[in-house]
Regions:
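Beta-strand-rich recognition/accessory modules
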Residues: 1-46
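Aromatic-lined carbohydrate-binding/catalytic grooves of carbohydrate-active enzymes
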Residues: 49-183
Length: 184
């Protein structure tokens, strides 16, 4: 994406709190420091966040190639392990031969990966005692998506479509975009 904030002389801009750290040692040492520094924010969070669900996101098992078949195998391996949600990550929408990272935007379920639609996979997730979830990078449109070419609903900056590498961005102020994404 693209974001900037111009602060003129005499003006000020306040950012949200961020936690940064450095240390001598390894990754475990720095992680420990960050967890300790952030725990006061987590521990003092609202009541609704005290009991957060445990989520299994399948991305690091399918690497953007989820299918009904491989999700059923994963479900068999993780059943009874305390997960509340099973999230189907990227790739569920990609067309044959096109990488997921340039396919987002049209968001049509792949009939190759899910020949019976997502419904059958959702049913399998529920049968294993978990709630189904699905990943959307809702704001982006990849260069292989049909929506990439229809620039009338994409975000513009200085009169040009805002493009970052191989991605463009939906204009979330556009009622068409809200309707389109709601239906997806």
């Amino acid at each position: 994406g693209d974001w900037k904030k111009t602060v003129k002389p005499g003006e000020h801009f306040e950012t949200p709190t961020a936690i940064l750290s450095v240390c001598e040692g390894g990754i475990d040492d720095i992680c420990h420091r960050l967890v300790c520094a952030g725990s006061k924010y987590v521990d003092n969070g609202p009541e609704s966040e005290q009991e957060l669900p445990i989520i299994f996101n399948e991305y690091c098992t399918t690497w953007g190639n989820p299918s009904h078949e491989n999700i059923c195998k994963i479900l068999e391996n993780i059943k009874g392990r305390g997960f509340d949600y099973f999230v189907i990550d990227c790739g569920w929408f990609k067309e044959d031969g096109i990488p997921w990272d340039i396919s987002m935007g049209d968001y049509n379920v792949s009939s190759t990966l899910f020949p019976q639609g997502l419904e059958k996979t959702v049913e399998a997730i529920r049968e294993k005692g978990m709630k189904p979830g699905i990943w959307f990078e809702i704001e982006t449109v990849g260069s292989a998506a049909r929506a990439y070419q229809d620039t009338s609903h994409l975000l513009h900056k200085d009169g040009a479509v805002l493009t970052s590498y191989f991605r463009r961005f939906w204009d979330m102020r556009d009622p068409y975009v809200e309707d389109y994404l709601t239906k997806k």
